[in-house]
């Protein structure tokens, strides 16, 4: 805890409000709310916490707070602040939350369409459906049963569906609008689950077709009845009152929360939504934040009722969700909330089980890798790769895997300093010497295994540096790729030989992941350096354009091409004088002409 935070903690009020934690860059990394700001904010810096909270606290170098008049006002403010700042430690709802709906348009002659966007007073909406496939299947069934208008053709034209008997053009079949009203009413009844009359009508038509020996038509009616029955079985009846409602349940364990939402429409469960995330506040408060974000998404249909668990404050929910909020006390409705809560508990336990299984598999892969190489269990693995284009802007990168997982805080980047031209062996020698001479000198943690990206030559260079130059006893292996640039062989031993490694083994997947990660990290760094060098060479020697302004241009425009495409006004908006902007544009033009001249 720094002195600034210590001083600010003394000044916190005993009031409700919101607090904003910031990192060393001044970026807001977490937004929270509190009934008592003094108690809540101080709690982050006192006592012990779980690992994820300790990680959050380790990044806090400053905080701000906003006092509110009430808990409700704090909740609303928190939701808005999260929406505006998108802090990395706050709850993040999944991006693919817009579910499909069936919509009856409010045109003079309505159509049935599928949409993911709800607009007020723009028609009647039914759903949501769990996915596009389900919505399309329901629509296809309706298209076969009801020949209502399916196109936007002018009233004096027919469409393709008319010739299939699935669209009754209103100027040809019926000019009476009352016919269309009855047809749309039938569709509404069907979508609301009142399909007994429709099934009876179809059954009568099937029997009539059979008596007329029109067996193909009778089979079509039979298939339609079967389709309705199938759709019925996919929708579990959860209540007898045919009400539209969302039912919330949540469960917390080991610093994680799972929220389950049951979408019940016309008394039938048609979809559920599951979200798992780490939480840092009280469980009830983070659940409220989740609900606020959930319904702030305009694509979430707000039903007639929302059921919430017993522990949640109804008034606070009512302040953020404009519908009837119910906290069931007994009977069927309470059982529905209990069912949502039970599903949340099961989903969270499944997550933990999968994590435990993954840990066991990864641990097994590390054990097996150590056994195959005849070394101690390689708990810490450091891997290296070079990146350059014909020797220009040469760089290297190191990634670290601890217990089979990437430890990104330990990743390192290297600019090659002593090598001229494309020489991978010399570059690898320089980087390994720089890395492990420092490990030796400063007593840093050494890896259990070093992996270099390359074949026999790279491994021999690495072993020469580690064993002969530095006198260290760290095992070195090489990962060799095939002609498709895919992980192919593991080289190890003295003399070097290919280690037999089953392609479907966990240890092979681990090595493949390590090689992909170090390659990605090296290439990304090389692009950054190359782009920066391109900036420097093009923008060097321009009067009035110093390092700070060049850095500003680099951050904003990313490339010289983007600067060339920008207007003078856009560049001046960064605080760069007009005369300097003109010099920049002239320099870019001159460079372009030089390259194009013979």
UniProtKB/Swiss-Prot annotation:
One Pfam family, short name: UVR
Molecular-function GO terms, alphabetical: DNA binding; excinuclease ABC activity
Predominant location category: cytoplasm
Signal sequence, renumbered to the chain: none
GO BP, one annotated term: nucleotide-excision repair
Location in the cell: Cytoplasm
Domain of life of the organism encoding this protein: Bacteria
Function: The UvrABC repair system catalyzes the recognition and processing of DNA lesions. UvrC both incises the 5' and 3' sides of the lesion. The N-terminal half is responsible for the 3' incision and the C-terminal half is responsible for the 5' incision.
Assembly and oligomerization: Interacts with UvrB in an incision complex.
UniProt xrefs under HAMAP family: UvrC
PANTHER family cross-referenced by the UniProt entry: UVRABC SYSTEM PROTEIN C, UVRC/OXIDOREDUCTASE
Protein name per UniProt: UvrABC system protein C
Gene it is expressed from: uvrC
């Amino acid at each position: 805890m720094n002195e600034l935070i210590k001083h600010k903690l003394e000044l916190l009020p005993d009031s409700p409000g919101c607090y904003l934690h910031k990192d060393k860059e001044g970026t807001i990394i977490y937004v929270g709310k509190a009934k008592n700001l003094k108690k809540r904010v101080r709690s982050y810096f006192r006592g012990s916490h779980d690992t994820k909270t300790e990680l959050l606290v380790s990044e806090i170098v400053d905080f701000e707070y906003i006092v509110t008049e009430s808990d409700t006002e704090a909740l609303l403010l928190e939701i808005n602040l999260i929406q505006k700042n998108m802090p990395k430690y706050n709850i993040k709802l999944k991006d693919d939350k817009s579910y499909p709906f069936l919509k009856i348009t409010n045109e003079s002659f309505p159509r049935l369409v599928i949409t993911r966007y709800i607009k007020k007073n723009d028609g009647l909406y039914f759903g949501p459906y769990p996915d596009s496939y389900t919505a399309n299947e329901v629509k296809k069934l309706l298209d076969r049963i009801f020949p209502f208008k399916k196109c936007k053709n002018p009233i004096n034209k027919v469409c393709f569906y008319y010739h299939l008997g699935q669209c009754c053009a209103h100027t040809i079949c019926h000019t009476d609008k009352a016919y269309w009203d009855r047809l749309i009413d039938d569709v509404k009844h069907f979508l609301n689950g009142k399909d007994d009359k429709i099934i009876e009508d179809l059954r009568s038509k099937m029997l009539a077709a059979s008596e007329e020996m029109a067996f193909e038509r009778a089979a079509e009616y039979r298939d339609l009845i079967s389709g309705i029955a199938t759709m019925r079985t996919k929708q579990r009846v959860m209540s007898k009152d045919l009400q539209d409602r969302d039912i919330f349940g949540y469960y917390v364990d080991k610093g994680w929360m799972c929220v389950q939402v049951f979408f019940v429409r016309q008394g039938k469960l048609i979809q559920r939504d599951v979200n798992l995330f780490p939480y840092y506040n009280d469980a009830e408060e983070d659940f409220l934040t989740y609900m606020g974000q959930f319904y702030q998404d305009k694509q979430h249909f707000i039903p007639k009722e929302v059921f919430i668990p017993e522990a949640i404050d109804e008034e606070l929910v009512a302040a953020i969700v404009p519908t009837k909020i119910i906290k069931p006390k007994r009977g069927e409705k309470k059982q529905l909330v209990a069912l949502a809560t039970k599903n949340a508990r099961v989903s969270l336990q499944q997550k933990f089980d999968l994590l435990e299984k993954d840990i066991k598999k990864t641990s097994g892969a590390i054990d097996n890798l150590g056994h195959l190489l005849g070394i101690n269990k390689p708990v810490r693995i450091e891997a290296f790769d070079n990146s350059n284009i014909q020797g220009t802007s040469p760089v290297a990168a190191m990634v670290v895997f601890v217990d089979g997982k990437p430890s990104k805080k330990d990743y390192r980047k290297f600019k090659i300093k002593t090598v001229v031209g494309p020489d991978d062996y010399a570059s690898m020698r320089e980087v390994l010497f720089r890395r492990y001479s420092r490990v030796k000198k400063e007593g840093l943690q050494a890896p259990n295994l070093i992996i270099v990206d390359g074949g026999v030559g790279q491994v021999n260079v690495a072993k020469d540096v580690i064993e002969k130059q530095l006198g260290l006893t760290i095992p070195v292996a090489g990962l060799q790729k095939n002609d498709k640039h895919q992980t192919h062989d593991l080289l190890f031993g003295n003399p070097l030989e290919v280690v037999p490694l089953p392609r479907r083994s966990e240890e092979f997947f681990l090595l493949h992941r390590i090689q992909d990660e170090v390659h990605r990290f090296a290439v990304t760094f090389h692009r950054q350096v190359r782009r920066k060098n391109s900036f420097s060479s093009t923008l060097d020697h321009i009067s009035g354009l110093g390092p700070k302004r060049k850095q500003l241009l680099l951050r904003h425009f990313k490339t010289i091409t983007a600067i060339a495409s920008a207007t003078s006004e856009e560049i001046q908006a960064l605080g760069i004088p007009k005369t300097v902007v003109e010099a920049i544009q002239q320099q870019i033009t001159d460079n372009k002409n030089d390259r194009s001249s013979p």
